[in-house]
Amino acid sequence: MKLPEKKVKKLIGMMNSLTQVKIPPMKPILEIFDMAMDEKTLDYLLRVGTEEHTLRDLKKLYIRMYGRADYDANWENFWKEIYEMSFLIPGEEDSEKFLLATIFPGWIELSVSGPLNKKRAAIIEKFMTFWDLLRKVNIAPIRMLTDMQGMRELKTNEPHMSTFLSTGKKAVPLNEPLTSEHQVRTAGDVYELLARHKDQLSVMNCICRTHKQISGGGDCEYGLPIEGCINIGPLSRQLVDNGISRRLTYEEACNLIEDFEKKGCIHTLFHYGSSTDKEAINICNCCNDCCLLYSSYQKGYISKVFVKSFYSPQMIDESRCTGCNKCGKYCATGATYYDKEAKKLVFDYDSCVGCGQCVTQCAFDVRKMVPDERPVFAKTRKRA
Protein backbone atom coordinates (compact mmCIF):
# COMPACT_ATOMS: atom_id res chain seq x y z
CA MET A 1 0.00 0.00 0.00
CA LYS A 2 1.10 3.60 -0.56
CA LEU A 3 1.78 5.36 2.71
CA PRO A 4 1.22 9.09 3.33
CA GLU A 5 4.43 10.63 2.03
CA LYS A 6 4.57 13.35 4.65
CA LYS A 7 4.49 10.78 7.46
CA VAL A 8 7.12 8.59 5.80
CA LYS A 9 9.46 11.55 5.36
CA LYS A 10 9.00 12.42 9.02
CA LEU A 11 9.99 8.87 10.04
CA ILE A 12 12.96 8.97 7.67
CA GLY A 13 14.06 12.20 9.35
CA MET A 14 13.79 10.58 12.78
CA MET A 15 15.81 7.55 11.68
CA ASN A 16 18.43 9.79 10.07
CA SER A 17 18.76 11.78 13.30
CA LEU A 18 20.17 8.64 14.95
CA THR A 19 23.04 8.13 12.50
CA GLN A 20 25.87 9.85 10.67
CA VAL A 21 24.70 8.21 7.43
CA LYS A 22 21.72 10.16 6.16
CA ILE A 23 19.49 8.46 3.57
CA PRO A 24 17.55 10.99 1.46
CA PRO A 25 13.79 10.44 1.00
CA MET A 26 14.08 9.72 -2.71
CA LYS A 27 11.45 7.76 -4.62
CA PRO A 28 13.05 4.27 -4.26
CA ILE A 29 13.42 4.78 -0.50
CA LEU A 30 9.81 5.92 -0.14
CA GLU A 31 8.73 2.85 -2.11
CA ILE A 32 10.72 0.57 0.21
CA PHE A 33 8.79 1.95 3.17
CA ASP A 34 5.57 1.23 1.26
CA MET A 35 6.73 -2.37 0.77
CA ALA A 36 7.94 -2.85 4.34
CA MET A 37 5.17 -1.52 6.59
CA ASP A 38 1.53 -0.49 6.82
CA GLU A 39 0.20 2.84 8.09
CA LYS A 40 -0.55 1.46 11.55
CA THR A 41 3.10 0.49 11.97
CA LEU A 42 4.19 3.84 10.57
CA ASP A 43 2.02 5.75 13.04
CA TYR A 44 3.26 3.62 15.93
CA LEU A 45 6.94 4.14 15.09
CA LEU A 46 6.37 7.88 14.81
CA ARG A 47 5.00 7.81 18.36
CA VAL A 48 7.87 5.63 19.60
CA GLY A 49 10.28 8.39 18.59
CA THR A 50 14.04 8.34 19.04
CA GLU A 51 14.26 7.41 22.74
CA GLU A 52 14.91 3.92 24.11
CA HIS A 53 11.89 2.06 25.54
CA THR A 54 11.28 -1.12 27.51
CA LEU A 55 8.94 -3.69 25.99
CA ARG A 56 6.50 -2.86 28.77
CA ASP A 57 6.55 0.81 27.74
CA LEU A 58 5.98 -0.17 24.11
CA LYS A 59 2.95 -2.23 25.10
CA LYS A 60 1.53 0.66 27.11
CA LEU A 61 2.00 2.98 24.13
CA TYR A 62 0.09 0.57 21.89
CA ILE A 63 -2.80 0.42 24.37
CA ARG A 64 -2.94 4.23 24.57
CA MET A 65 -3.05 4.44 20.77
CA TYR A 66 -5.41 1.58 19.92
CA GLY A 67 -7.13 0.45 23.12
CA ARG A 68 -7.09 -2.68 25.29
CA ALA A 69 -9.36 -4.73 23.02
CA ASP A 70 -7.13 -4.13 20.00
CA TYR A 71 -4.09 -4.96 22.14
CA ASP A 72 -5.56 -8.28 23.28
CA ALA A 73 -6.46 -9.22 19.71
CA ASN A 74 -3.51 -7.91 17.71
CA TRP A 75 -0.45 -6.97 19.78
CA GLU A 76 1.36 -10.29 19.46
CA ASN A 77 1.32 -10.30 15.65
CA PHE A 78 1.94 -6.55 15.47
CA TRP A 79 5.06 -6.81 17.65
CA LYS A 80 6.25 -9.91 15.79
CA GLU A 81 6.28 -7.95 12.51
CA ILE A 82 8.15 -4.98 14.00
CA TYR A 83 10.67 -7.30 15.68
CA GLU A 84 11.23 -9.40 12.56
CA MET A 85 11.66 -6.36 10.32
CA SER A 86 14.14 -4.87 12.84
CA PHE A 87 12.35 -1.52 12.89
CA LEU A 88 13.26 -1.53 16.59
CA ILE A 89 16.53 -3.02 17.83
CA PRO A 90 18.12 -3.55 21.27
CA GLY A 91 19.27 -0.27 22.79
CA GLU A 92 22.93 0.57 23.13
CA GLU A 93 22.78 1.68 26.75
CA ASP A 94 20.39 -1.04 27.91
CA SER A 95 19.90 -4.16 25.79
CA GLU A 96 16.57 -4.79 27.54
CA LYS A 97 15.25 -1.62 25.93
CA PHE A 98 14.47 -1.00 22.26
CA LEU A 99 15.58 1.80 19.95
CA LEU A 100 14.34 2.97 16.55
CA ALA A 101 16.61 1.52 13.88
CA THR A 102 18.42 3.58 11.26
CA ILE A 103 17.74 2.99 7.54
CA PHE A 104 21.03 1.98 5.91
CA PRO A 105 23.14 0.72 7.48
CA GLY A 106 20.10 -0.31 9.49
CA TRP A 107 16.76 -2.05 9.18
CA ILE A 108 16.88 -2.47 5.40
CA GLU A 109 19.76 -4.96 5.37
CA LEU A 110 18.83 -6.44 8.75
CA SER A 111 15.37 -7.32 7.45
CA VAL A 112 16.45 -8.81 4.11
CA SER A 113 19.60 -10.74 5.06
CA GLY A 114 17.91 -14.02 5.96
CA PRO A 115 16.90 -16.85 3.60
CA LEU A 116 15.69 -15.21 0.41
CA ASN A 117 11.98 -14.80 -0.25
CA LYS A 118 9.95 -12.60 -2.62
CA LYS A 119 9.58 -9.69 -0.20
CA ARG A 120 13.26 -9.61 0.71
CA ALA A 121 14.31 -9.88 -2.94
CA ALA A 122 11.96 -7.04 -3.90
CA ILE A 123 13.32 -4.75 -1.17
CA ILE A 124 16.91 -5.52 -2.18
CA GLU A 125 16.19 -4.79 -5.84
CA LYS A 126 14.44 -1.53 -4.97
CA PHE A 127 17.30 -0.41 -2.74
CA MET A 128 19.77 -1.07 -5.55
CA THR A 129 17.80 1.27 -7.83
CA PHE A 130 18.51 3.94 -5.21
CA TRP A 131 22.17 2.97 -4.97
CA ASP A 132 22.56 3.03 -8.76
CA LEU A 133 21.76 6.73 -8.71
CA LEU A 134 25.29 7.22 -7.35
CA ARG A 135 26.56 6.04 -10.73
CA LYS A 136 24.02 7.89 -12.87
CA VAL A 137 24.92 11.24 -11.32
CA ASN A 138 28.64 10.68 -11.92
CA ILE A 139 29.07 13.34 -14.59
CA ALA A 140 31.95 15.80 -14.71
CA PRO A 141 30.36 18.77 -12.85
CA ILE A 142 28.86 16.64 -10.06
CA ARG A 143 32.01 14.52 -9.80
CA MET A 144 34.09 17.68 -9.41
CA LEU A 145 31.76 19.13 -6.78
CA THR A 146 31.55 15.94 -4.71
CA ASP A 147 35.33 15.53 -4.84
CA MET A 148 35.76 19.13 -3.69
CA GLN A 149 33.37 18.45 -0.83
CA GLY A 150 35.27 15.28 0.03
CA MET A 151 38.57 17.13 0.12
CA ARG A 152 37.07 19.81 2.39
CA GLU A 153 35.77 17.13 4.74
CA LEU A 154 39.23 15.58 4.69
CA LYS A 155 40.51 18.71 6.40
CA THR A 156 37.59 19.55 8.67
CA ASN A 157 35.48 16.48 9.51
CA GLU A 158 35.96 13.07 11.04
CA PRO A 159 36.04 10.33 8.39
CA HIS A 160 33.00 8.16 7.76
CA MET A 161 34.87 4.88 8.28
CA SER A 162 38.14 3.60 9.68
CA THR A 163 40.43 0.98 8.21
CA PHE A 164 42.85 -1.23 10.07
CA LEU A 165 45.11 -3.87 8.63
CA SER A 166 43.29 -6.93 7.37
CA THR A 167 46.03 -9.21 8.63
CA GLY A 168 48.35 -9.61 11.57
CA LYS A 169 47.87 -10.26 15.27
CA LYS A 170 48.82 -6.96 16.90
CA ALA A 171 45.79 -5.86 18.91
CA VAL A 172 44.49 -2.33 19.05
CA PRO A 173 42.72 -1.73 22.40
CA LEU A 174 38.98 -2.14 21.84
CA ASN A 175 38.12 0.28 24.63
CA GLU A 176 39.55 3.22 22.69
CA PRO A 177 36.67 4.59 20.58
CA LEU A 178 37.17 6.14 17.15
CA THR A 179 34.91 8.96 16.02
CA SER A 180 34.03 7.67 12.56
CA GLU A 181 31.26 5.60 11.04
CA HIS A 182 32.83 2.19 10.65
CA GLN A 183 36.05 0.48 11.56
CA VAL A 184 38.04 -2.08 9.64
CA ARG A 185 40.21 -4.02 12.05
CA THR A 186 42.98 -6.55 11.86
CA ALA A 187 42.02 -10.19 11.97
CA GLY A 188 43.67 -10.36 15.36
CA ASP A 189 41.47 -7.56 16.64
CA VAL A 190 38.39 -9.26 15.25
CA TYR A 191 39.21 -12.45 17.17
CA GLU A 192 39.48 -10.38 20.33
CA LEU A 193 36.10 -8.78 19.66
CA LEU A 194 34.52 -12.17 18.98
CA ALA A 195 35.89 -13.48 22.27
CA ARG A 196 34.30 -10.58 24.12
CA HIS A 197 30.88 -11.50 22.68
CA LYS A 198 31.42 -15.25 22.37
CA ASP A 199 27.95 -16.08 23.71
CA GLN A 200 26.18 -13.71 21.29
CA LEU A 201 27.48 -14.44 17.79
CA SER A 202 25.65 -15.22 14.57
CA VAL A 203 26.07 -14.95 10.81
CA MET A 204 23.63 -13.65 8.21
CA ASN A 205 23.57 -13.28 4.44
CA CYS A 206 25.48 -10.40 2.85
CA ILE A 207 23.04 -8.05 1.09
CA CYS A 208 25.73 -7.19 -1.48
CA ARG A 209 26.46 -10.79 -2.51
CA THR A 210 22.76 -11.64 -2.41
CA HIS A 211 22.02 -8.83 -4.85
CA LYS A 212 24.80 -9.95 -7.17
CA GLN A 213 23.28 -13.42 -7.36
CA ILE A 214 19.65 -12.42 -7.84
CA SER A 215 20.59 -9.86 -10.48
CA GLY A 216 22.36 -12.50 -12.56
CA GLY A 217 25.91 -11.62 -11.57
CA GLY A 218 26.71 -15.10 -10.27
CA ASP A 219 28.86 -16.06 -7.31
CA CYS A 220 31.55 -13.89 -5.73
CA GLU A 221 34.72 -14.08 -7.82
CA TYR A 222 36.74 -14.29 -4.60
CA GLY A 223 34.90 -17.43 -3.56
CA LEU A 224 33.16 -15.80 -0.62
CA PRO A 225 29.87 -17.28 0.59
CA ILE A 226 26.52 -15.54 0.81
CA GLU A 227 26.72 -15.90 4.61
CA GLY A 228 29.30 -13.23 5.31
CA CYS A 229 28.11 -10.74 7.93
CA ILE A 230 28.81 -11.63 11.55
CA ASN A 231 26.52 -10.12 14.19
CA ILE A 232 27.63 -9.57 17.76
CA GLY A 233 25.89 -8.68 21.01
CA PRO A 234 22.15 -8.36 21.78
CA LEU A 235 21.24 -7.59 18.15
CA SER A 236 22.62 -11.01 17.23
CA ARG A 237 20.09 -12.62 19.55
CA GLN A 238 17.22 -10.71 17.93
CA LEU A 239 18.34 -11.70 14.42
CA VAL A 240 18.60 -15.36 15.43
CA ASP A 241 15.09 -15.17 16.91
CA ASN A 242 13.89 -13.67 13.60
CA GLY A 243 15.39 -16.44 11.50
CA ILE A 244 17.64 -13.88 9.80
CA SER A 245 20.89 -15.05 11.39
CA ARG A 246 22.36 -18.45 12.19
CA ARG A 247 23.90 -18.83 15.63
CA LEU A 248 27.68 -19.33 15.74
CA THR A 249 30.05 -20.67 18.35
CA TYR A 250 33.19 -18.66 18.99
CA GLU A 251 35.25 -21.31 17.19
CA GLU A 252 32.97 -21.24 14.14
CA ALA A 253 33.17 -17.45 13.97
CA CYS A 254 36.97 -17.52 14.18
CA ASN A 255 37.13 -20.11 11.39
CA LEU A 256 34.98 -17.89 9.18
CA ILE A 257 37.20 -14.88 9.82
CA GLU A 258 40.30 -16.92 8.98
CA ASP A 259 38.76 -18.10 5.72
CA PHE A 260 37.57 -14.60 4.79
CA GLU A 261 41.02 -13.24 5.59
CA LYS A 262 42.76 -15.56 3.15
CA LYS A 263 40.27 -14.69 0.41
CA GLY A 264 40.92 -10.97 0.63
CA CYS A 265 38.27 -9.53 2.93
CA ILE A 266 38.39 -6.26 4.78
CA HIS A 267 36.75 -6.69 8.18
CA THR A 268 34.45 -3.68 8.61
CA LEU A 269 32.86 -3.01 11.98
CA PHE A 270 29.45 -1.33 12.02
CA HIS A 271 28.28 0.44 15.17
CA TYR A 272 25.16 1.95 16.64
CA GLY A 273 24.44 5.12 14.69
CA SER A 274 27.36 4.37 12.36
CA SER A 275 29.63 5.96 14.95
CA THR A 276 32.65 4.16 16.35
CA ASP A 277 32.39 5.82 19.73
CA LYS A 278 29.42 3.48 20.20
CA GLU A 279 29.18 -0.29 20.59
CA ALA A 280 29.93 -2.51 17.60
CA ILE A 281 27.04 -4.65 16.38
CA ASN A 282 28.18 -6.19 13.10
CA ILE A 283 31.33 -7.28 11.27
CA CYS A 284 30.90 -6.97 7.52
CA ASN A 285 33.52 -8.87 5.53
CA CYS A 286 33.92 -6.74 2.42
CA CYS A 287 35.36 -7.71 -0.96
CA ASN A 288 36.12 -5.82 -4.17
CA ASP A 289 33.74 -7.87 -6.28
CA CYS A 290 30.42 -7.55 -4.46
CA CYS A 291 30.69 -4.86 -1.76
CA LEU A 292 28.52 -1.79 -2.30
CA LEU A 293 31.30 0.46 -1.01
CA TYR A 294 34.37 -0.85 -2.85
CA SER A 295 32.93 -2.53 -5.93
CA SER A 296 30.75 0.50 -6.62
CA TYR A 297 33.74 2.80 -6.19
CA GLN A 298 35.73 0.82 -8.75
CA LYS A 299 32.83 0.98 -11.24
CA GLY A 300 32.56 4.75 -11.04
CA TYR A 301 29.84 5.44 -8.51
CA ILE A 302 30.10 8.70 -6.56
CA SER A 303 32.76 7.88 -4.00
CA LYS A 304 31.70 7.05 -0.45
CA VAL A 305 35.24 6.00 0.47
CA PHE A 306 36.10 8.49 3.22
CA VAL A 307 38.01 6.63 5.89
CA LYS A 308 40.48 6.97 8.69
CA SER A 309 43.49 4.81 7.93
CA PHE A 310 45.97 3.66 10.55
CA TYR A 311 48.56 1.97 8.35
CA SER A 312 50.20 2.24 4.95
CA PRO A 313 52.53 -0.09 3.02
CA GLN A 314 56.26 0.51 3.12
CA MET A 315 58.68 -0.95 0.57
CA ILE A 316 61.10 -3.60 1.81
CA ASP A 317 62.66 -4.69 -1.49
CA GLU A 318 60.98 -3.94 -4.82
CA SER A 319 63.37 -6.27 -6.63
CA ARG A 320 61.50 -9.19 -5.06
CA CYS A 321 58.36 -8.28 -7.03
CA THR A 322 57.52 -10.84 -9.73
CA GLY A 323 54.81 -8.76 -11.41
CA CYS A 324 51.96 -11.12 -10.48
CA ASN A 325 49.73 -8.10 -9.72
CA LYS A 326 47.95 -9.78 -6.82
CA CYS A 327 48.30 -6.48 -4.98
CA GLY A 328 46.34 -4.79 -7.76
CA LYS A 329 43.62 -7.44 -7.75
CA TYR A 330 42.99 -7.12 -4.01
CA CYS A 331 43.48 -3.35 -3.58
CA ALA A 332 40.08 -1.85 -2.78
CA THR A 333 40.76 1.57 -4.32
CA GLY A 334 43.27 0.84 -7.09
CA ALA A 335 45.94 2.56 -5.05
CA THR A 336 48.56 -0.02 -6.01
CA TYR A 337 49.21 -2.35 -8.94
CA TYR A 338 52.02 -3.66 -11.13
CA ASP A 339 52.56 -1.59 -14.29
CA LYS A 340 53.56 -4.12 -16.94
CA GLU A 341 54.85 -1.50 -19.38
CA ALA A 342 56.96 0.36 -16.84
CA LYS A 343 57.79 -2.93 -15.10
CA LYS A 344 57.38 -1.49 -11.63
CA LEU A 345 54.92 -1.18 -8.78
CA VAL A 346 52.63 1.83 -8.76
CA PHE A 347 51.42 3.25 -5.46
CA ASP A 348 49.09 6.19 -4.85
CA TYR A 349 49.44 7.12 -1.20
CA ASP A 350 46.47 9.48 -1.22
CA SER A 351 44.04 6.71 -2.27
CA CYS A 352 45.38 3.97 0.02
CA VAL A 353 42.94 3.04 2.79
CA GLY A 354 45.51 0.94 4.65
CA CYS A 355 43.66 -2.38 4.48
CA GLY A 356 46.90 -4.35 4.12
CA GLN A 357 45.73 -6.79 1.45
CA CYS A 358 48.67 -5.83 -0.81
CA VAL A 359 50.92 -7.26 1.90
CA THR A 360 48.66 -10.17 2.86
CA GLN A 361 48.38 -11.49 -0.68
CA CYS A 362 52.05 -11.03 -1.62
CA ALA A 363 54.16 -14.18 -1.27
CA PHE A 364 57.49 -12.40 -1.63
CA ASP A 365 57.61 -9.87 1.23
CA VAL A 366 57.96 -6.91 -1.09
CA ARG A 367 56.29 -4.54 1.38
CA LYS A 368 55.25 -4.35 5.00
CA MET A 369 52.56 -2.36 6.77
CA VAL A 370 53.67 0.43 9.09
CA PRO A 371 51.67 2.66 11.46
CA ASP A 372 50.38 5.75 9.67
CA GLU A 373 47.24 7.40 11.04
CA ARG A 374 45.57 9.70 8.50
CA PRO A 375 42.23 10.51 6.88
CA VAL A 376 41.75 9.28 3.31
CA PHE A 377 39.24 10.35 0.69
CA ALA A 378 39.37 8.32 -2.54
CA LYS A 379 38.24 10.62 -5.34
CA THR A 380 35.45 9.43 -7.60
CA ARG A 381 36.52 7.57 -10.71
CA LYS A 382 35.00 8.15 -14.12
CA ARG A 383 32.14 5.78 -14.88
CA ALA A 384 33.25 2.37 -16.13
Which residues make up each language-model segment?
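Long, low-complexity, charged/polar intrinsically disordered regions in eukaryotic proteins
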Residues: M1-E31
